[in-house]
Amino acid sequence: MLSWAITFLIIAIVAAVLGFGGIAGAATGIAKILFIVFLVLFVASFFFGRGRG
């Protein structure tokens, strides 16, 4: 799943260089959503993992 986030991030960066529009805007939106999802999962695993010792 992390590879998908990195793939969409690279597509979004290339799209930003070429100008946002069409599929570029969609890739940027997907990259933002995946970034937020992984950030939430990271924070959750950090706090729940601390209890295990």
Curated annotation (Swiss-Prot):
Transmembrane as UniProt keyword: yes
What does the UniProt keyword field contain? Cell membrane, Membrane, Transmembrane, Transmembrane helix
Show the InterPro entries listed in the entry: DUF1328
Primary site of residence: membrane
Where, subcellularly, is it found? Cell membrane
Q: Which protein family is it in?
A: Belongs to the UPF0391 family.
Give the matching NCBIfam families: PRK13682.1-1, PRK13682.1-4
State the protein's name.
Answer: UPF0391 membrane protein PP_0135
**Which species does this protein come from?**
Pseudomonas putida (strain ATCC 47054 / DSM 6125 / CFBP 8728 / NCIMB 11950 / KT2440)
